[in-house]
Amino acid sequence: MGLGRCIWEGWTLESEALRRDMGTWLLACICICTCVCLGVSVTGEGQGPRSRTFTCLTNNILRIDCHWSAPELGQGSSPWLLFTSNQAPGGTHKCILRGSECTVVLPPEAVLVPSDNFTITFHHCMSGREQVSLVDPEYLPRRHVKLDPPSDLQSNISSGHCILTWSISPALEPMTTLLSYELAFKKQEEAWEQAQHRDHIVGVTWLILEAFELDPGFIHEARLRVQMATLEDDVVEEERYTGQWSEWSQPVCFQAPQRQGPLIPPWGWPGNTLVAVSIFLLLTGPTYLLFKLSPRVKRIFYQNVPSPAMFFQPLYSVHNGNFQTWMGAHGAGVLLSQDCAGTPQGALEPCVQEATALLTCGPARPWKSVALEEEQEGPGTRLPGNLSSEDVLPAGCTEWRVQTLAYLPQEDWAPTSLTRPAPPDSEGSRSSSSSSSSNNNNYCALGCYGGWHLSALPGNTQSSGPIPALACGLSCDHQGLETQQGVAWVLAGHCQRPGLHEDLQGMLLPSVLSKARSWTF
């Protein structure tokens, strides 16, 4: 009896264990079959075949909208989505599907922030049992943003433009700089597909439409939508928002303003003035720089302009700035005025007093006067003081390099010789004093020579040694002179400056003068 009882109890315990194992395996098979029939995946990262059919978007405030693209379940099923916060334990929000959509409204204390993170699961009942599927283990609301469309869109027509204004939710006002808008406007009778668009409107709640953008005389419509602006690349990931455009706002109608005629200033368009000024500067600028900075161009254009530097050079290099001495050294010959032409013999003296002496000096070899040449022909025609031409003209006038003109008043004249030189002819020949009476031409000749002589000229008593002298010979012939035609006059003068004496002597007018004068300076 004892042995049979033990065997019976062993079979009973084994049967109970087997039944428990069979029940566990049967329950597992039922769950697997149910999940396969419903098509819901329970894979950990939301990679199941049906998890991607859910799309949940947030308005970034307190609302989350979800859409399910799977076929609807039977009438007896009531699916829902459960949002479980990964940061606040126990924080769950249920979104019941109505057809293929559902909306969950969060409580005011659970307003969405960029750091929010949720786990989404799908729940439904099957044969009296609740079935659970994992949709998204880490749902970030800031990555799925679809804002509400702008509200209260209004228009304000003014002269030449139209101003559009709109409003946003007060909860989004702190994020105004992160909002980007797009405007669409068209004529009222046109379709929205033909509307004009203006985008990249960031951080503002108003916009201006110019009159030239609209068709005058037509009624236009405008509407607006918004999305989160694309931030720079240097923004941290926790503050970056992504999403899609909101729905279009309600359109607003307005009358297009009239276009105003272009205001043209009296001088024309500003662009034309700018072009004219630019061309003027391009033409005058290089020319100014060319003349201002190029000495070679200056020399080319101004090479024919005479310079008085050579004329005044002896004033400082020879006479040490003494203007009176310099003027005396640059004496000039006799120059009769036009009133003396054809003057009778009795009225000749006033004209002679107007005469001036022209002093000339050659650069290398002096020109010999007629009086000096006659000195070489005869012994009776030598200069006063028994000076020969060698004593008067030793080396020529080399002190001055150019011929100069000056006018010297004739005050005093002194007769020194009765020999009158002959007038110069065109062939360079010289005639004797005896043929002067047959010459019908009036003439006046003056020669100037610089040199050294040992004795002073008449009237010069300031120096007994060798002094520099400038001899001037002047002879004039006039038809109908007095009988003393052979008498000549010598101009003797003396100029003195520190370290240097200059004497003037020469042959002057014949004895038509009523008196003899000597002029010393």
UniProtKB/Swiss-Prot annotation:
Motif (WSXWS motif): 245-249
Fibronectin type-III domain ranges (all copies): 149-259
Extracellular side: 41-270
Single GO cellular component term: external side of plasma membrane
Membrane keyword on record: yes
Motif (Box 1 motif): 301-309
Glycosylation sites recorded in the entry for this protein: 117, 156
Main location as per UniProt: membrane
Residues in the signal sequence: 1-40
Annotated GO MF terms: interleukin-9 binding; interleukin-9 receptor activity
Listed GO biological process terms: cytokine-mediated signaling pathway; immunoglobulin mediated immune response; interleukin-9-mediated signaling pathway; regulation of cell population proliferation; signal transduction
Intervals, Cytoplasmic compartment: 292-521
InterPro entries, per the entry: FN3_dom, FN3_sf, Hempt_rcpt_S_F1_CS, Ig-like_fold
Keywords in alphabetical order: Cell membrane, Glycoprotein, Membrane, Receptor, Secreted, Signal, Transmembrane, Transmembrane helix
Subcellular localization, as worded in the UniProt entry: Cell membrane; Secreted
Membrane topology: Single-pass type I membrane protein
Domain text: The WSXWS motif appears to be necessary for proper protein folding and thereby efficient intracellular transport and cell-surface receptor binding.
Miscellaneous field: The gene coding for this protein is located in the pseudoautosomal region 2 (PAR2) of X and Y chromosomes.
Family that this chain belongs to: Belongs to the type I cytokine receptor family. Type 4 subfamily.
Subunit description: Interacts with IL9.
Protein name, entry field: Interleukin-9 receptor
